[in-house]
């Protein structure tokens, strides 16, 4: 069973090793989807949505929302942001009944990246 929660955050960045308009400082309203894969526990839930919101807020949004992403990570492409989120969340959401399935980052309404476990290991 897949459980998913979505978040948004606003941030600025520039792509230093890219030649094009994204080389200049600019911002996005990013959308983040965190998806867990698992089975229901003794409370008949894969994961408590409130707990997932708290974890993502503490580990991800406090660092990325209204941030200059170049101060947080090197070359903050959508791909690198998704990998960064995965690494920050993986252990925090792991339970006997579930684990992180995917992290999806939308840079625009029509452009996104999805990271799976095999992309990180």
Briefly describe each language-model feature range.
Residues 1-121:
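Charge-rich, low-complexity N-terminal segments
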């Amino acid at each position: 069973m897949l459980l998913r929660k979505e978040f948004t955050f606003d941030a600025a960045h520039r792509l230093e090793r890219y030649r094009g308009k994204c080389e200049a400082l600019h911002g996005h309203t990013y959308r983040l989807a965190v998806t867990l894969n698992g089975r229901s526990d003794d409370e008949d839930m894969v994961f408590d949505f409130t707990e997932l919101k708290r974890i993502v807020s503490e580990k991800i949004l406090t660092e990325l929302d209204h941030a200059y992403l170049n101060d947080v990570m090197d070359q903050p492409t959508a791909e690198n942001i998704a990998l960064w989120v995965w690494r920050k969340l993986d252990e925090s959401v792991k339970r006997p009944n579930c684990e992180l399935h995917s992290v999806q980052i939308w840079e625009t309404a029509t452009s996104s990246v999805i990271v799976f476990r095999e992309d990180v290991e």
